[in-house]
Amino acid sequence: MAKKNDPLFTSFFIELYPEFYQKLKTVQPNLTLVEQKVCFYLKLKFTTKEIAECTFVSVKAIQNRKNRLRKRLYIETDVDIYIWIDQL
């Protein structure tokens, strides 16, 4: 479902990980749907390349989205974003 960029992916993910979703919304309640989806893919341990393939955008676009997420979620540059997301 995630690898096919299925529109139901978001609702299915929220059903499976409701606590994660609530914590994410607590940290930054104004995330866009695209930003939320990138967080969901990161939670599932998708690589930047895999996220790009699933969302039909370039690797560079995903790198930029991850950098913007760092700013929006107040993640320091020396912190691994995968670990931060996983510990949320």
Q: Where is each model-derived feature located?
A:
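Cytosolic nucleotide-binding catalytic cores of signal-transduction proteins
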Residues: 3, 7-88
